[in-house]
UniProtKB/Swiss-Prot annotation:
ATP binds at K205, G296, E327, G356, G357, D358, S359. Pfam families: PGK. The gene is pgk. Its main location: cytoplasm. It comes from Rippkaea orientalis (strain PCC 8801 / RF-1) (Cyanothece sp. (strain PCC 8801)). Transmembrane segments: none annotated. GO terms for molecular function: ADP binding; ATP binding; phosphoglycerate kinase activity. HAMAP family: Phosphoglyc_kinase. Belongs to the phosphoglycerate kinase family. This is Phosphoglycerate kinase. GO terms for biological process: gluconeogenesis; glycolytic process. Signal peptide: none annotated.
């Protein structure tokens, strides 16, 4: 499934045209100050490309969860200010995303100018994918570009609805890169392919583990979910997090890995804590020596060595989810070691894909984000794509 992208649009296709671009400007704010503008910068290649080709660029995004009401603190004005600084040109801030005032503002745009529509989620119809709202949103544009991978797994008016009223409908550079890396890793990986799955719960990663067991050569499991696997093996896990209703599933996943010939690696030692706190007392033990009253919050140093050895010959790696409670420095060593290992492997030619969510925060915290082949910008969207699901926002785009 190859989707049309902005690369397929010539200057003649877009010059003088009104191009509606769905971006993800859901950035963290402290008052009116943007504390991290990564998502704004990530959209710049698509925006600049359209400016250079002489389009009238109309950007739309959600911000926070205003639940269909106008919430003053969730207006996109600070985003327009920052975007204007990054582009080095003015950005017209609209007072709504549909209606006469928006139409008037867009009609004033010259070729190569940019307007930002107000928060889409001030209208409940956005998340409901209301056709009438989608039609109003599309009425001010000629064609559509989706560059918001983080919301591609949702069928909203701005991600799916508008495509029924505009043509062509294409992917921006960000979505194109996501599809190139994530789909290639699943459908046609360079082998050996190793998947590293972490996080606290097996339940949230069942789909991705099951899909990757069909695709990968080795599967490394870390994070809180390891204790469900240990308990399923009959080991004592103390006060560690366990999903008792997933013990049979854990057994079946291990059995499936064996049946498929996939190396299934669980930690051999863990770092225990006497309570869930950054200053808890800690000790490292073998997995068969976990005592009552203690909980595992990280993988141990022996496990790190075993995992590093398993990763040494890999050509592709997908990492989703931390190895421990990396927010606490005392229990971040496992996650940090894996991040550094992947950074080194990238330097040797391995394709390293950080599949969204907490693993992205982890590689950023360690300072090796720029050393990975690809960092996915979507949390839920990355997981669903890795699970092999169809994402509505991608399915709605034109085929090549």
């Amino acid at each position: 499934m190859t989707k049309k992208s902005i690369v397929n649009l010539s200057p003649a296709d877009v010059a003088g045209k009104r191009v509606l671009v769905r971006v993800d400007f859901n950035v963290p704010l402290d008052g009116a100050t943007i504390t991290d503008d990564t998502r704004i910068r990530a959209a710049l290649p698509t925006i600049k490309d359209l400016i250079e080709k002489g389009a009238k660029v109309i950007l739309c995004s959600h911000f926070g969860r205003p639940k269909g009401q106008v919430v003053e603190s969730m207006r996109l004005t600070p985003v327009a200010t920052r975007l204007s600084e990054l582009l080095g040109q003015p950005v017209v801030m609209c007072d709504d995303c549909i209606g006469d005032s928006v139409t008037a503002a867009i009609n004033q745009l010259q070729n190569g100018q940019v307007a930002l529509l107000e928060n889409l989620r001030f209208h409940a119809e956005e998340e409901a994918n209301d056709p009438e709202f989608a039609q109003k949103l599309a009425a001010n544009a000629d064609l559509y570009v989706n560059d918001a991978f983080g919301t591609a797994h949702r069928a909203h008016a701005s991600t799916e609805g508008v495509t029924h009223y505009l043509s062509p409908n294409v992917a921006g550079y960000l979505i194109e890169k996501e599809l190139n890396y994530l789909q290639a890793a699943i459908e046609n990986p360079q082998r050996p392919l190793v998947a590293i799955i972490g996080g606290s719960k097996v339940s949230s990663k069942i789909g991705v583990i099951e899909t990757l067991l069909e695709k990968c050569d080795k599967l490394i499991i870390g994070g809180g979910m390891i204790f469900t696997f240990y308990k399923a093996r009959g080991l004592n896990v103390g006060k560690s997090l366990v999903e008792d209703d997933k013990l049979e599933l854990a057994k079946s996943l291990e059995a499936k890995a064996k049946e498929k010939g996939v190396d299934f690696l669980l930690p051999t030692d863990v770092v225990l804590a006497d309570n869930f706190a950054p200053d808890a007392n800690a000790k490292t033990v073998s997995i068969d020596a976990i005592e009552d009253g203690w909980m595992g919050l990280d993988i141990g140093p022996e496990s790190v060595k075993v995992f590093q050895a398993a990763l040494a010959d890999c050509k592709s790696v997908i990492w989703n989810g931390p190895m421990g409670v990396f927010e606490f420095d005392k229990f971040a060593k496992g996650t940090e070691a894996i991040a550094h290992t992947l950074a080194e492997l990238t330097g040797k030619g391995t394709i390293t894909i950080i599949g969204g969510g907490d693993s992205v925060a982890a590689v950023e915290k360690v300072g090796v984000a720029d050393k990975m082949s690809h960092i996915s910008t979507g949390g839920g969207a990355s997981l669903e794509l890795l699970e092999g699901k169809v994402l509505p926002g991608i399915a709605a785009l034109d085929e090549v």
